């Protein structure tokens, strides 16, 4: 049996005691692990860590960001079989479908690698008499998203 911890401020943490949920293998009907659930304090700690990291990430050049995402993509690819096996045991998907989910996750990361190119500002000359338009894209701060957990990976 394994335990899924929270990753906050660069380290794995068990979070608030007593808040967890079983992970069950639907094919065998048995518990295979536990996932720690976040409390309000855990979320506050994660947001505070992200706010502390924000200035450094905002100053990171787009090429460096792409390299970091490429490394993440390489790790997903390297561990594709292991990830697919986890999806199969936790969700009951057949292995081929689970591998497809990992592949779709890889495609999303590959798309994200190219996003820094879209972060460039624009200059449009003569939008009006003696008027030029300049746009500059800058990170604004920490955001959070509550997203579907089940696809892709």
Question: What are these regions, as identified by a protein language model?
Answer:
Residues 25, 37, 137:
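Conserved strand-loop elements at the edges of beta-sheets that form or border functional pockets
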Residues 9, 17, 32, 91, ...:
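Short glycine-rich loop/turn motifs that provide flexible caps or phosphate-binding loops at active sites
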Residues 32-119, 130:
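Glycine-rich loop-to-alpha-helix module at the N-terminal edge of alpha/beta enzyme cores
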Residues 1-28:
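Hydrophobic face of amphipathic alpha-helices that form TPR/SEL1-like repeat modules
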Residues 122-153:
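Conserved small-residue-rich beta-alpha loop and adjacent elements
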Residues 10, 29, 65, 109, ...:
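Residue-level signature of catalytic and energy-coupling elements of molecular machines
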Residues 22-23, 40-43, 153:
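A short local loop/turn or secondary-structure capping micro-motif enriched for an aromatic residue
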Residues 15, 97, 152-153:
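Secondary-structure boundary/capping motif
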């Amino acid at each position: 049996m394994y335990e899924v911890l929270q990753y906050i401020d660069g380290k794995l943490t068990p979070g608030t005691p007593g808040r967890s949920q079983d992970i069950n293998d639907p094919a065998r009907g048995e518990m295979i692990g536990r996932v720690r659930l976040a409390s309000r304090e855990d979320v506050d700690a994660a947001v505070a860590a992200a706010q502390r990291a924000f200035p450094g990430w905002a100053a990171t050049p787009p090429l460096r960001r792409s390299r970091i995402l490429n490394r993440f993509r390489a790790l997903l690819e390297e561990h594709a079989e292991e990830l697919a096996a986890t999806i199969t045991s936790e969700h009951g998907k057949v292995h081929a479908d689970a591998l497809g989910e990992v592949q779709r996750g890889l495609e999303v990361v590959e798309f994200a690698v190219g996003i820094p190119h879209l972060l460039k500002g624009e200059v449009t000359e003569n939008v009006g008499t003696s008027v030029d338009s300049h746009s500059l894209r800058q990170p604004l701060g920490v955001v959070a998203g509550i997203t579907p957990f089940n696809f892709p990976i």
